[in-house]
């Protein structure tokens, strides 16, 4: 084949052997008939079957591969022309409601160039199988090979051998390179098959719960207390992640350490890859959304591939699970265990939590001046993380009874303490509850604004504070919006008094709050109220002892505390209330209450200012401390908790 004799001026469309054969025929001069067979010994080869069994060189292999590709391209172009010819326009009629259009099923290229939108069933079209599209567009060589292997010839038993694909006659070098690419792609496809299976699940969360139970042998719900809101914050979180790459598993401990105070990490493997179970306590409280974004970035997995809930901390079984797995070699633990695990697994803490002491709860409520049942229950429950008695209270089935008993006992102690104090001791005690420093001048300026002489007002206030008979009631009267209620409410608030209302006068017990108060206020007394007081309450206004009816209790004898009354009616000018003139001291506020441009009060009547007012004028009001009390009181703070006796050796 290397001999090129007689092949000069070759044509562009003919090969060398054709020209040689033609020259031989014309130079021999032998007349060969068409019916006569050729001599088999002329060339020295057996030309019977016309098959050359000699070794095929590399050039011929590449030529055959090129010819194969050219034929495949030609066939593909022919098929595309037929599709364009017989399928018609790629546009679908607007009145057609066919979800699976013919052109979109045959060729994704035609479906991609549509200008009109077509409604599709999302759930059924989200993951199309390869059988629905026969064009092969967009599929890699690995996917095509997998498809052929899966759908083999049924006559051959489904052995998956490919027929008429053109790859059987390609060269050895091309096959070797493509085989390496197939192996790499097949490995990658095998790694992602589990993730694709997860994405195809209708309920991913249920699937994750099932996989978690298969891996760890217990339900994820058994370890957590579910949060309905994704915005609720918590410091402790239980996270289960699926489909994690093994390279991330090795570095996760170092990645999570700067963000957490404690981390309990467990790794297992399944068909989807690495599975992570971690109990983590962050340095700051985080919501579920924040935890999902943080761990999703560290683990390089989608947020819907994780189960994130806070742990169930009020369960000894759950705490024991984390404790036992933490000391085994199957887990990696970072930091100190949370107190709720230590509390329920260490014997000393368990014994301390077993008994509840009501006296400690009452002492706490008394020290914090909390007497309302709802406030006691809420505030004391929040101490469960660091107070053993509060923890025992939370574990008790009698919380409502304990709260009620605590509130009753606290009110009894507070009432007895108030009754024991004189008015000057009470004012000093109320002043200790105000931390800020005020100014007494705004109160004096407000009284001058209402045309009230300060010295006469101070003398009347002194008699009122000490409960002098016939001077036990002060009435602030005047037109509306003059600051009567504001002035009296601020004074009652500082002195810790009570407020009664005539709206409850139909009840026999509407005066019952007077039994537990040091001072009192009756706001906005109308004509019927003054009539009622003139008829039934003359003895009370005198400041003399009188009996008060209390609900579910016997009548009690009390001395009415100093009483403030606000009204728009000036009883000093009403003749029909002449019997109240000597019992009620009246001050008139004629001017409107002043405000600045921003709507703030010009004269601030705050607790700090009232504290400064009584401290500044204590000598004029006869409430200053005596010489015996200047060095401090010798009385100890109230204690209702039994103390421990220390025996000396």
Curated annotation (Swiss-Prot):
Query: Which residues does ATP bind?
Result: 478-485
According to the UniProt entry, the cross-link of type Glycyl lysine isopeptide (Lys-Gly) (interchain with G-Cter in SUMO) is at: 559
Query: What ranges does the record give for the region Disordered, renumbered to this chain?
Result: 146-188
Which key words tag this protein in UniProt? ATP-binding, DNA replication, DNA-binding, Early protein, Helicase, Host nucleus, Hydrolase, Isomerase, Isopeptide bond, Nucleotide-binding, Phosphoprotein, Ubl conjugation
Query: What residues bear Phosphoserine in this entry?
Result: 89, 93, 107
Tell me which EC number(s) this protein carries.
Answer: 5.6.2.4
Q: Where is the composition biased (Basic and acidic residues)?
A: 148-188
Q: Where is this motif: Nuclear export signal?
A: 106-115
> Which compartments does it reside in?
Host nucleus
Q: Tell me, in one coarse class, where this protein mainly resides.
A: host cell
As annotated in the record, motif Nuclear localization signal runs over: 83-85
Q: Which GO terms describe its biological process?
A: bidirectional double-stranded viral DNA replication; DNA replication; protein hexamerization; viral DNA genome replication
All residue ranges annotated as the SF3 helicase domain in the record: 452-602
Q: Extract the InterPro entries matched here.
A: Helicase_SF3_DNA-vir, P-loop_NTPase, PPV_DNA_helicase_E1_C, PPV_DNA_helicase_E1_N, PPV_E1_DBD, PPV_E1_DBD_sf, Rep_E1_papillomaV, Znf_lg_T-Ag_D1_dom_sf
Instruction: One Pfam family, please name it.
Output: PPV_E1_C
| Example GO molecular function | TPR domain binding
Task: Name the family the entry cites.
Answer: Belongs to the papillomaviridae E1 protein family.
Give a short account of what the protein does: ATP-dependent DNA 3'-5' helicase required for initiation of viral DNA replication. It forms a complex with the viral E2 protein. The E1-E2 complex binds to the replication origin which contains binding sites for both proteins. During the initial step, a dimer of E1 interacts with a dimer of protein E2 leading to a complex that binds the viral origin of replication with high specificity. Then, a second dimer of E1 displaces the E2 dimer in an ATP-dependent manner to form the E1 tetramer.
Oligomeric form and interacting partners: Can form hexamers. Interacts with E2 protein; this interaction increases E1 DNA binding specificity. Interacts with host DNA polymerase subunit POLA2. Interacts with host single stranded DNA-binding protein RPA1. Interacts with host TOP1; this interaction stimulates the enzymatic activity of TOP1.
Q: What is this protein called?
A: Replication protein E1
Please give the organism. Answer: Human papillomavirus 11
Source organism phylogeny: Viruses, Monodnaviria, Shotokuvirae, Cossaviricota, Papovaviricetes
